[in-house]
Amino acid sequence: TSSYKASVKGYGEVMPIDALTLVAQVSGRITQLSDTFQTGAVVKKGEVLAFIDDTDYVEALSSAKTDYESAVVALEEERLQGVQALDEWQRSGLEGEPASALVLRQPQLKAAQASLDEAKQVLETAKRDLAFTEITAPFDALVVTRDVSLGSYV
């Protein structure tokens, strides 16, 4: 047996598996760009490419934390007022159930719980928005073009 060495030449077009136009998920002014975030550079998954001014987002998070803590206190106060109302109703000597749920503060307790749930949602949104002020590479990639500069508003 003998061996034969074949050589093949061809032309083609290379296409990426994934292509992405990266956009910010929150708005603001670009305060810092990574040195590696340049046209033609290869970036790694999770690498921070740019920072958006986070001042407003830090303030929003602080406010959301305060509102959440206030809602926790308000719910506990309302729960205790309901316990006190039930105790007063039982000590009054009246028979049966109160004519209205308002007497035992049940609607007020539900409203306080709803306020807490809303405050929790606002807090989670504020945390997420603050995290989005760091623009990161979603996967290992080649930067084809960089259409943002320091100071740009996105």
What are these regions (language model features)?
Residues 6-10:
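Regulatory alphaC helix of protein kinase catalytic domains
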Residues 24:
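Conserved phosphate/oxyanion-binding catalytic-loop motifs
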Residues 1-3, 13-15, 27, 31-32, ...:
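Periplasmic scaffold and linker elements that assemble and bridge Gram-negative envelope complexes
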